[in-house]
């Protein structure tokens, strides 16, 4: 297998957490960092190089220019800016769309032909804007979507059932935001639906829907209130996406994918189960949703699309 090259655009906490996770898993032999502040990119590259001395395999980390992206296999984009005091969400979204469009054009001009993973928020909207501006295929433009929300859900279910999170099949779908929802009708442990598994094993399944909502909907706020930001969890989740693609696992994970008729919608990037393999998103999986879940999915699509269309008018 040829050596893997991964480029990071945006050397903030999330980007650096991803790169550190990827390094320790041995996902690539070469890493490059692009940041609006070249000194910051250099400083992080130096720090990561020092860390690499303790790894059991050789890697290189350096500051990249956009021209260096031509033969990269992956680009992970976390670049964007936070909300300013007094600024509306729409103004922030419009400005971050402008930023991602500029990045997309520079990436395309470099000759890059690999897989782009977008993590910048609001991720569903920014991923769509990047895809539209770059013209890259749906397979090769992947949003982080609700991957972290899903990881939190699986952890909460596993803790309740006293099993490994790897034994839990559960998805948070829709927007990476307030309109996301848990697909309760699809929760399984060891192949058994949650309620059936509960009866088999004697675990308490009363009020489980209400109790599982908390770690999904409030966990990020709990972290932000205590340490101002979340980054290790999403960094590890993105490394997992990259790992599955590199290893061509064909595993099913949640990711932000562009819908082309799946679930009855077109043109919206949203968190859904996908098959990950060497080509990126190899298939979108349409799981069965009950009527309540279908309504929530449609509401989430409508919210994402409206914000995107309104932001475009504001540019």
From Swiss-Prot:
- Which compartments does it reside in? Cytoplasm
Q: Where does the protein principally reside?
A: cytoplasm
Which InterPro entries does the record associate with it?
L-lactate/malate_DH (IPR001557), L-lactate_DH (IPR011304), L-lactate_DH_AS (IPR018177), Lactate/malate_DH_C (IPR022383), Lactate/malate_DH_N (IPR001236), Lactate_DH/Glyco_Ohase_4_C (IPR015955), NAD(P)-bd_dom_sf (IPR036291)
Superkingdom field: Bacteria
- Which parts of the sequence carry Phosphotyrosine? 221
Which Gene3D superfamilies does UniProt cross-reference here?
Lactate dehydrogenase/glycoside hydrolase, family 4, C-terminal, NAD(P)-binding Rossmann-like Domain
Q: Which GO terms describe its cellular component?
A: cytoplasm
Entry keyword set: Cytoplasm, NAD, Oxidoreductase, Phosphoprotein
Query: Could you tell me the Gene Ontology terms of the biological process aspect for this record?
Result: glycolytic process; lactate metabolic process
State its Enzyme Commission number(s).
Answer: 1.1.1.27
State where substrate binds.
83, 89, 121-124, 149-152, 230
**Biological or metabolic pathway of the protein:** Fermentation; pyruvate fermentation to lactate; (S)-lactate from pyruvate: step 1/1
- An example of a Pfam family matching this protein is Ldh_1_C
Q: Name one GO molecular function term.
A: L-lactate dehydrogenase activity
**Binding residues for NAD(+):** 14, 35, 66, 119-121, 144
Q: Does the keyword Oxidoreductase apply?
A: yes
Catalysed reaction(s) here are: (S)-lactate + NAD(+) = pyruvate + NADH + H(+)
Catalytic residue list: 176
Under the heading NCBIfam families, the entry gives:
L-LDH-NAD (TIGR01771)
Record's subunit section = Homotetramer.
Its annotated function is as follows: Catalyzes the conversion of lactate to pyruvate.
PANTHER family for this protein: L-2-HYDROXYCARBOXYLATE DEHYDROGENASE (NAD(P)(+)), L-LACTATE DEHYDROGENASE
Q: What is this protein called?
A: L-lactate dehydrogenase
Source organism: Mesomycoplasma hyopneumoniae (strain 232) (Mycoplasma hyopneumoniae)
